[in-house]
Swiss-Prot record:
It catalyses: Endonucleolytic cleavage of RNA, removing extra 3' nucleotides from tRNA precursor, generating 3' termini of tRNAs. A 3'-hydroxy group is left at the tRNA terminus and a 5'-phosphoryl group is left at the trailer molecule. The active site is at D67. Binds 2 Zn(2+) ions. Signal peptide: none annotated. It holds the Pfam family Lactamase_B. SUPFAM superfamilies: Metallo-hydrolase/oxidoreductase. CDD domains: RNaseZ_ZiPD-like_MBL-fold. Zinc phosphodiesterase, which displays some tRNA 3'-processing endonuclease activity. Probably involved in tRNA maturation, by removing a 3'-trailer from precursor tRNA. This is Ribonuclease Z. Zn(2+) 2 binds at D67, H68, D212, H270. It comes from the Bacteria. Zn(2+) 1 binds at H63, H65, H141, D212. The keyword Hydrolase applies.
């Protein structure tokens, strides 16, 4: 599991930062990639990374401001030309379906793969399978905006092969049955319960990715005990009034959420273009003064998510 930040700027692109897009690479876990937001030129940024559009299986849109969605029609269209044939699902607030359908229709763009659009109308779980579930809550922004909590379900512990050997159980198909938790009768009449030969489960990881937001309770709830929190930090601490007026957060406010939610690691993104060059170092210093385990995202930078 790995983050690839495709765009870390706010509002408009700058020379150093493109607008919002984050790829969550799940290649080892499920052979695919999830994209969070898709600002203008996202597909161009992808060209400089290991992300493959044909492997993108889900796109989660936080809200419908242009710096988070204007790259979506182009990416959806190009995916067809880049070998994308597998289904793709787009999740987002009410209006995302109309935006996509109008953009593709007016430009006579035809996708050659199954495309599903899910409009989020209620808070709660928007996706779940055997590996993950994704939960969402409304944040505090000028328009409807969601944050996403991605929870990896606990992974079954390993088969205790040495314990089986000590019990004089020979390798073979029986190992798989025991690993599947079956109760198995051996040729000598012994009955083994697979659960007795499986190690403790490996705890799944929790990732929280927030859209644009003021400091709010929903952010803290979504981030509770997360391994990684990705939080916007549009403004420096001194610009708190502007942050509030424009429905955004400061570096210190993002760090406070991380501290209050007991997260392990905070990554700041959505940095205003007013902070150029090495000014990001001061933003990072402000956040670290509140929450030590803070990093700041840069375009095309990768962050592995450790267990």
């Amino acid at each position: 599991m790995e983050f690839v930040f495709l765009g870390t700027g706010a509002g408009v692109p700058s020379k150093g930062r493109n607008v919002s897009a984050i790829a969550l690479q799940l290649l080892e876990e499920r052979g695919g990639t999830w994209l969070f937001d898709c600002g203008e030129a996202t597909q161009h940024q992808i060209l400089h990374t290991s992300v493959r559009p044909r492997r993108i299986e889900k796109i989660f849109i936080t809200h419908l401001h242009g710096d988070h969605i204007f790259g979506l029609p182009g990416l959806l269209g190009s995916r067809s030309f880049q070998g994308g044939t597998t289904p793709l699902t787009v999740y987002g607030p009410k209006g995302i379906e109309q935006f996509i359908e109008v953009a593709l229709s007016v430009s006579t763009t035809h996708v050659k793969y199954p495309l599903e659009i899910v409009e989020i109308t209620e808070e709660g779980i928007v996706f779940e399978d055997k590996q993950f579930y994704v939960e969402t809550k409304r944040l505090s922004h000028g328009i409807e905006c969601f944050g996403y909590r991605i929870v990896e379900k606990d992974i079954q512990g390993p088969l205790l092969v040495e314990k089986l050997r000590e019990a004089n159980v020979k390798p073979g198909p029986i190992f798989k049955r025991l690993k599947d938790g079956e109760i198995v009768e051996l040729e000598d009449g012994r009955v083994l319960d697979g659960k007795d030969f499986i190690g403790p489960p490996q705890k799944g990881r929790i990732i929280t990715i927030l859209g644009d937001t003021r400091y709010c309770d929903a952010s803290r709830i979504l981030a509770q005990d997360a391994d990684v929190l990705v939080h916007e930090a549009t403004f420096a601490a001194a610009d708190q009034t502007q942050a509030h007026d424009y429905f955004h957060s400061t570096t210190e406010q993002a760090a406070r959420i991380a501290l209050e939610a007991n997260v392990k690691r905070l990554i700041l993104t959505h940095i205003s273009s007013r902070y150029q060059g090495d000014m990001y170092k001061e933003l990072l210093r402000e956040a670290k003064a509140v929450f030590a385990h803070t990093e700041i995202a840069m375009d095309l930078k990768s962050f592995p998510v450790e267990r």
